[in-house]
UniProtKB/Swiss-Prot annotation:
Keyword list, A-Z: Cell projection, Cilium, Coiled coil, Cytoplasm, Cytoskeleton, Flagellum
Similarity annotation: Belongs to the DRC1 family.
Species whose genome carries this gene: Chlamydomonas reinhardtii (Chlamydomonas smithii)
Coiled-coil regions, chain positions: 183-367, 655-685
Protein name in the entry: Dynein regulatory complex protein 1
Compartments, record wording: Cytoplasm, Cytoskeleton, Cilium axoneme; Cytoplasm, Cytoskeleton, Flagellum axoneme
Designated gene of the protein: DRC1
Amino acid sequence: MDELQSQTEREARILARRKRIQERLAALREGDHGGGKEGENKEEIGKGKQQIIESKRRLMRVKYRTDQDVSSVRVAGDDRENQHRIQEEQTRQDLRAKLLAEAEQSARQNAAVAMRWADLFSIEVPQDLYNEIESQRQACERIIASKDKLIGEIKGELKKKDDEFVKTLKRQAEDIDTLLQYMSRQFVEVQNAYKEELDEIENAFLQERSDLLESNRREMQELFDKRSRLEQDFMDRYLAAVEAYQSQLEGHRQMDAEEYHILKIRLETDIQNLEQHLEAMRATYQLNTEKLEYNYRVLKEREKENTQTIESQKKKLSRQRDILSSLKQRYAETDRRYRDDNMKLTDEYKRITEQFKDLQSKFRHFELVDTKKYKEVWGMKEADVAALVRQLLQADKVLHEQQLGWDWRPPDDAVFAPVHGDAGSGGGAAAAATGGAAGGAAAAGGVGPNGEEESEEDAAARVREAELAERLRDGRNWGALGLLCDEAGFLIDIKARNMIERLPKDEQGQVKAEAILRSLGIADGSAFDALLEALSADSNIELRAKGMVAPQGRGMAEEKSDRGGTAVLVHPDEAVRRLKAFVEVYGTGPSRGPGGGGGGGGGMSGPMRVQGAMRRAAEREQEFWSRMTHVISDKHTRVWGALEKQLEKYLALLQERAGSLRDVESLQHQNNELRALLNQYLSSRINDELQIPPTQII
């Protein structure tokens, strides 16, 4: 922005200078054309007037030449300043690019160092551990060396700026001296030219003195007056130009000093930040070194303890074998007793399950009623708030259009969009989800002696597993599964990861994908399709996670059928964020059990869906109140405050004027009374008896 403004000012100065040059050249050409005509009438107009014309021409040429010398200093200074600013901007951009490149490289190196710390705990050979620690130390030293190099470059650039500032001050001082020399030379040359031309004019008029004395005296007086005016105009222009040049020089000097001060402060701040970061890295390195030494000593002590523990456990093993035989006998007796207890508890469980279902239906009924009442109260309060906000907007419109005369733009209609579209839809859905989740949990938890219920649950589980296995075998889904294995491997348990590493290479990918899906709670084909839709490039899962209104995307199966191939996947850097949004929208979560995502909702956790719906409803309500409180911007509020202050001043002025008008009316009334009293005194009969009546004096 500063470069564009300086470029515009420079072009404006160049155009103004060209215009002045063209006007002076036109004046010179008019003088040259007029000179030919004056040569023909030289004898008619006389030597004095001819000398005046030639003197004006010469003075104009002298003035034009000296003005060019004076303005050349400013033009050269403007060009040099423009080049300096362009070079300064290029240097700033280069330094910024170096800082960004070093920050990115340092971030990558720090990430690499941080990632390798976790691998050191799995190394058991001391020599290998020492080699890895040594490599980590070398990596840290390389990071510190790169930052020291960048700090050195910044310090060199700062010193270069100091030297450049000193040189600039010297160059400006030289330009000022040169400008003063040109100005003094201009003054001397113009003064000498005026003196010489005046002498020539006087000599010409002295030659005609004998013939035209009276006329020449009048002309000489006019010429002297004209010369005085010219000298006065010249001095005025000279002083104005001097003041303008001084103000411009002072402005440029202040601008350069401010820019230098700002740049110096910014560079010193960057140096301090880098030094603090360096000290923090050194402290972190020292702390990690001490931790590793301590852990090494602890491991040595534990190794000794483990050796002693193994010897003691061998002795205990023989004793435990004897105890095992006695426990088997006790187990047989206890097993018979617990079977009888299990039959009794099963009957009790069935009775409690029926009571729980009845309680759940009552809970859904009361929740629907409460939600409906809440929606009605919310709708009523929302309408009241909208009416108040519309009144506020109407007042804002009146202030802008009638008081200020400004254009007023109404806010978007989306500001008054209702939070709950249907009074009972949100509560009914939440209650249904709650009931479905509870019923599913009860059905999944009830493993009793009823063989028919168990067979139905097993059949449903087998169907879901078959759907999921079919999706995993589909070659079009391998890209998405590979993306999950690469970016979501942290969801796999450490023990499971160790077991997967022992498998053959061709089986590791499928087993890893299944483990990740179980961690995400994906248990059937519909949940898997929803996950693939969330990982597609054109998915709106993040908008839905934020509670924003977004069009419902098509299913992954429809998308693949329309395209006839694999859908375009999201970038790997955004995969984790998409998975997080998927968990927030569908309420899935890490699951360690064999059922994956639970028993209800197609692999989705019902209670978590309810919590997600309630959270999104709360966010929409919070967003509604935020819109209502910010419908009038801070700028309009400041305008109201300023308008109120000015109207208060205007009211005070009107009140003062009203008081002045009352004073004027009082004075007029007193004046009328005095006039009537004076007329009464003047018309009194006693005035006729006086020797000098007042009527003769007034």
